[in-house]
Amino acid sequence: MSILPIVIAPDERLITRASEVTDINDKIKELVNDMFETMYDAEGLGLAAVQVGVLKRIFVVDVQLETIENEPAGYGSTGKFYMINPEITELSDEQVILKEGCLSIPEQSHEIKRPKYLTVKYKDLDNEEQTLKASGWLARCIQHELDHLNGILYIRHLSKLKYDMAITKAQKIKKQHEQ
């Protein structure tokens, strides 16, 4: 396993839609393991393949933050998952505002409104289709990482003014990291 370099915004790869995984082979399995290792090293909750420069529809999440009181039956708010070719099949009408951050937009966090619950289907490393009902931070992380796979940075959910300010700050931080 290895720690992969994380792509920092602004970068074209972060706003490019990732392609479907057509063959779940040893290279994909190694990528998933490397992504978990990279995410843990960076102290993140999730990481999309595009964030390590691989334009494939894969992400990993590990949410052990909380459990939700009065959680709907069958929904989970914690867990460690990798998802290949994920697709949200259901989103709740109920929404919640929480602060989000991103490994590709370091040193920033912003309040983002997202659906509270979701259902997602995805492939596992055995090419079997799985379905997960998620809530809380797990649902939020899945939505955030799926946005990455669709070429959408979480700051796109902000007003234009706040987005522009966030990108300007990201550019300054990226220049500092490159020096």
Curated annotation (Swiss-Prot):
Signal peptide: none annotated. The active site is at E145. GO terms for molecular function: metal ion binding; peptide deformylase activity. It comes from the Bacteria. Keywords: Hydrolase, Iron, Metal-binding, Protein biosynthesis. Its EC number is 3.5.1.88. The keyword Amino-acid biosynthesis does not apply. InterPro entries: Peptide_deformylase, Peptide_deformylase_sf. Its cofactor is Fe(2+). The keyword Hydrolase applies. It catalyses: N-terminal N-formyl-L-methionyl-[peptide] + H2O = N-terminal L-methionyl-[peptide] + formate. It is an enzyme of class 3 (hydrolase). Fe cation binds at C102, H144, H148. GO terms for biological process: translation. PANTHER family: PEPTIDE DEFORMYLASE (PTHR10458:SF22). Removes the formyl group from the N-terminal Met of newly synthesized proteins. Requires at least a dipeptide for an efficient rate of reaction. N-terminal L-methionine is a prerequisite for activity but the enzyme has broad specificity at other positions. This is Peptide deformylase. It comes from Wolbachia sp. subsp. Drosophila simulans (strain wRi).
